[in-house]
Swiss-Prot record:
Usually encoded in the trnK tRNA gene intron. Probably assists in splicing its own and other chloroplast group II introns. One of its GO terms (cellular component) is chloroplast. Pfam families: Intron_maturas2 (PF01348), MatK_N (PF01824). Belongs to the intron maturase 2 family. MatK subfamily. GO terms for biological process: mRNA processing; RNA splicing; tRNA processing. It comes from the Eukaryota. This is Maturase K. It is found in: Plastid, Chloroplast. One of its GO terms (molecular function) is RNA binding. Keywords: Chloroplast, mRNA processing, Plastid, RNA-binding, tRNA processing.
């Protein structure tokens, strides 16, 4: 118990006042629109030679640098404002809120950097681990040997006061906490965001950065407690545990864990070691997946531990009857826009001993990743690229743009989707998405020029084809076209990229 109290009691040096960046006032508007600021703080802090990566001098230098590239400055005290630049009250609140979200992210980015530095790891290596695709090779290597898994949806409704109290453990700045509470209650309709049926909230979906960050911090607190209790309750330590902290998604892996029985009344745990080789824990946003090669009885005990611990200490309530434990060979789960499952590949081996020969049937388990085509088409339908049945439609809102911008926008969306879903074992679903986007582009251009799609394809068909070709396809079609080899590998090969640090909005349909 004393060790737990020491863990919960933070050192004074770790408690910082995070309200000071707000004194820059007009600079809030500047850095609110810099999407790469969290990445630049890592790079510039090393290049400029600062020891304290959260120093006031560094923050001011970075904000000034961003501000110099901001040519459109809105002056609220202007006596003769231009009607074109007059913005609503909520618009300024959105800007301040996004800047406020950036300030909240600072301590957690520093926490990750310090964690990597303690282990003598270079930040350069960390850049590859930030990729969304980095988790899928891990699934391919480990999930094929596991038997049981369960995936649950974490309840999204959390009272705003609970989120504020989460910060009280690490921040002593009272004004910061009051300002955070003010934003959550006054301008962020958290209940509307957390309840799917209520779609009316003050800010746009792209400006939910602070709300999603606070929710992930709340869940991360639970996960850190979980690892701490495990490591201090047995002599069996985790072989590997890493936390890759991003804005909206976290990833963790724990091996050689222990079996835990819970007494529901006082929540004291009886712990002892079991002969369980490993458990894998993965979470992205609200999706939580646990997998093991143990029995369903073992997984049931883990399930009740998670639920009880979450309800008692974090006020998140689960419906236990809706959480099922499935056999990995008969269950598929959606994760990061992919539909993952275990595929059984039978193979026959002929063995011969002297004069006798016989056949041996082997079954090899392999993780198969497919594109979730139905939700992806639903996302395209919501974005007005097609109807609910997948029939392409024009995009009237883009009809006023130039031909180049229209083709470039459609081509960019298509390339991004192909790039992200390059790990799919079946590419034919992606070519259906390409067909929808290409025909939607043609209908948008035909609508603009007041002509038919057939006539437009006769004139610009080849240019549209080149715009929608992927870099991988260029390689196969132009490099391998001279060789007498089959192009079947184009449709079945899987490629995982290490430069994807965010999910396309069309893929992140949930």
């Amino acid at each position: 118990m004393e060790e737990i109290k020491k863990y919960l009691k933070l050192e004074i040096s770790q408690q910082r006042n995070f309200i000071y960046p707000l004194i820059f006032q007009e600079y809030i508007y500047a850095f609110a629109y810099d999407r790469g600021f969290s990445r630049s703080i890592l790079i510039l802090s090393e290049n400029l030679g600062y020891d304290n990566k959260s120093s006031l001098l560094l923050v001011k230098h970075l904000i000034t640098r961003i501000y110099q590239h901001n040519y459109f400055i809105i002056a609220p005290d202007d006596s003769n404002p231009n009607p074109f630049w007059v913005c609503s009250k909520n618009f300024f609140y959105e800007i301040i809120l996004e800047g406020f979200a950036f300030i909240v992210e600072i301590p957690f980015s520093l926490k990750l950097i310090s964690c990597l530095e303690e282990k003598n790891k270079k930040i350069v290596k960390y850049q590859n681990l930030r990729s969304v695709h980095s988790i899928f090779p891990f699934l391919e290597d480990n999930f094929s040997h596991l038997n049981c898994l369960f995936d649950i949806l974490i309840p999204h409704f959390v009272h705003t006061e609970i989120l504020v109290q989460t910060f009280r453990y690490c921040i002593t700045d009272v004004s910061f906490l009051h300002l955070l509470r003010f934003f959550l209650y006054k301008y962020c309709k958290w209940n509307s965001l957390m309840t799917p049926k209520k779609a009316s909230y003050s800010f746009s979906k792209s400006n939910q950065r602070l709300l999603l960050l606070l929710f992930n911090i709340h869940v991360y607190e639970y996960e850190s407690f979980f690892v701490f209790l495990h490591n201090h309750s047995s002599h069996l330590r985790s072989i590997h545990f890493e936390v890759l902290l991003e804005r909206i998604h976290f990833y963790g892996k724990m091996e050689c864990l222990i079996n835990i029985f819970i007494k529901l009344k006082d929540f004291h745990a009886n712990l002892w070691l079991v002969n369980e080789s490993c458990i894998h824990y993965i979470r992205y946003q609200r999706k939580l997946i646990m997998a093991s090669k143990g029995t369903s009885f073992f997984m049931n005990k883990w399930k009740f531990y998670f639920i009880t611990f979450w309800q008692c200490y974090f006020s998140l309530w689960f419906y236990t009857r809706r959480i099922y434990i499935n056999q990995s060979s008969n269950h598929s789960f959606e994760f990061f826009g992919y539909l993952s499952s275990l595929r059984m590949n039978p193979s026959v081996v002929r063995s011969q001993i002297i004069e006798n020969s016989f056949l041996i049937n082997n079954i090899i388990k392999k993780v198969d990743t497919l594109v979730s085509i139905i939700p992806l088409i639903s996302s395209l339908a919501k974005a007005k690229f097609c109807n609910v049945l997948g029939h392409p439609t024009s995009k009237p809102i883009w009809a006023d743009l130039s031909d180049y911008n229209i083709i470039d926008r459609f081509g960019c969306i298509c390339r991004n989707l192909f790039h992200y879903h390059s790990g799919s074992s079946k590419k034919k679903f992606l070519y259906r998405i390409k067909y929808i986007l290409r025909l939607s582009c043609a209908r948008t251009l035909a609508r603009k020029h007041k002509t038919t799609v057939r006539t437009f394809f006769k004139i610009f068909g080849s240019e549209l084809l080149e715009e929608f070709l992927m870099p991988e396809e260029y390689v196969f079609f132009f490099t391998l076209s001279k060789a007498s080899c089959s192009l079947q590998g184009v449709y079945i090969s899987r490629i995982w990229y290490l430069d994807i640090i965010s999910i396309n909005n069309l893929t992140n349909y949930k």
